[in-house]
A protein has these predicted regions:
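Internal, glycine-rich beta/alpha segment that forms the wall or movable "lid"
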Residues: 2-8, 82-175
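N-terminal beta1-alpha1-beta2 module of alpha/beta enzyme domains
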Residues: 1-71
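Active-site mouth loops of central-metabolism enzymes
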Residues: 10-23, 73-80, 151-161
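Short, basic, helix/turn surface patches
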Residues: 67-76, 96-99, 129
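Conserved beta-strand positions in the central sheet of alpha/beta enzyme cores
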Residues: 41, 67, 99-101, 177
Length: 177
């Protein structure tokens, strides 16, 4: 997986999926970290994989260098306050190594018979997350939400293939997956 932050050279990561034995998963993330991968990611699809933020917490306790994050979460199955709190917790556990990958939704959405987020919905979600990850309150669908305990912002990457999503990522994201 190639990851590019705005103004930075491309780095490489791997996806480690907790599929069974937790000890095997811990060994897998330790190996990826020791091999020098820049990022270790987990899939966020409730019907296919273990809970991504629990997996990332395990990874945080078994790695020292690689950045950690979901690749990718989505605006349909995750409320922005829950996502902000979850990734900020991973950031705290990993001593500042968290990143947040977001897309419109794939298997997590299809398996619930839902539709992926629109680009407008993705924009709204990412903008809200940027604010929440800075400890600022946000008006979300008519309700005021906040995550006042968060200590530092976490970089947000957007999955992008087409020109419209790439343009959106260039406007509001810290990087592209």
């Amino acid at each position: 997986m190639g990851i590019s932050e705005v103004g930075q050279e491309m780095r490489f990561g791997t996806v480690c999926l907790w599929r069974g034995d937790r000890h095997a998963y811990a060994t897998e993330v330790e190996l990826a970290d020791s091999l020098g991968y820049d990022m270790i990611c987990g899939g966020d699809s409730q019907s296919v994989y273990r809970e991504v933020y629990v997996s990332l917490a395990v990874a945080a306790m078994h790695t020292d260098q690689a950045r950690l994050g979901p690749m990718v979460t989505n605006p349909i199955t995750r409320h922005p306050a829950v996502t902000a709190s979850s990734i900020a917790t991973i950031d705290e556990l990993s001593d500042g190594r968290a990143v947040l990958g977001i897309g419109t939704g794939d298997s997590a959405i299809r398996n619930l018979s839902e539709r992926p987020a629109t680009l407008a919905g993705l924009r709204e979600y990412v903008v809200a997350l940027h604010e929440l990850l800075r400890g600022r309150p946000v008006d979300w669908h008519g309700k005021r939400i906040h995550t006042s305990w968060i200590q530092r912002p976490v970089p947000i990457y957007i999955t992008a293939e087409g020109p419209k999503t790439l343009e959106l990522a260039g406007e509001i994201a810290d990087g592209v997956v």
